[in-house]
């Protein structure tokens, strides 16, 4: 078993009309044994920028602390929030710095940039960026998430429709992956509000 699959995870981010959604499952396991059913994989960097971390749970928490620390330093120096593109470069550099003994995480970054234009990207464990204009996925449920998102996604969705689409894609995908599950966390972020919801899925 790959170390990336040790704790199990499912992460997806999707772009709508001047908004984005990011969702994850809630299971923390050790291989096939479930340890917790309310594990947080999506973290807020600031009001318009979120990062999701799939992979090894210990590295998820370590990396989030490092990202939060770097962003705080940036805020103190620049007196403004970081743009999503800048944050993606920061994450990429942090991961590449440790390329010979990498963090076992695949980040998904989603944010609203200038003129509230949505930005999403993912990268591998050594920081190679993959940009997208529709959706990005990561985690042990990535293959089924790709299929679900490709069949359900359509451009320029409003926040409520985007929530429905990403939720259905997530729930149908984690049903096909025994290492992720136990419902989901969904954040839908538009310029003037953040909707946070918890999904109840199959509890097995």
From Swiss-Prot:
InterPro entries: Ntn_hydrolases_N, Proteasome_beta_3, Proteasome_bsu_CS, Proteasome_sua/b, Proteasome_suB-type. The 26S proteasome consists of a 20S proteasome core and two 19S regulatory subunits. The 20S proteasome core is composed of 28 subunits that are arranged in four stacked rings, resulting in a barrel-shaped structure. The two end rings are each formed by seven alpha subunits, and the two central rings are each formed by seven beta subunits. The catalytic chamber with the active sites is on the inside of the barrel. Signal peptide: none annotated. It is found in: Cytoplasm; Nucleus. GO terms for biological process: proteasome-mediated ubiquitin-dependent protein catabolic process. Non-catalytic component of the proteasome, a multicatalytic proteinase complex which is characterized by its ability to cleave peptides with Arg, Phe, Tyr, Leu, and Glu adjacent to the leaving group at neutral or slightly basic pH. The proteasome has an ATP-dependent proteolytic activity. Keywords: Cytoplasm, Nucleus, Proteasome. This is Proteasome subunit beta type-3. Belongs to the peptidase T1B family. It comes from the Eukaryota. GO terms for cellular component: cytoplasm; nucleus; proteasome core complex, beta-subunit complex.
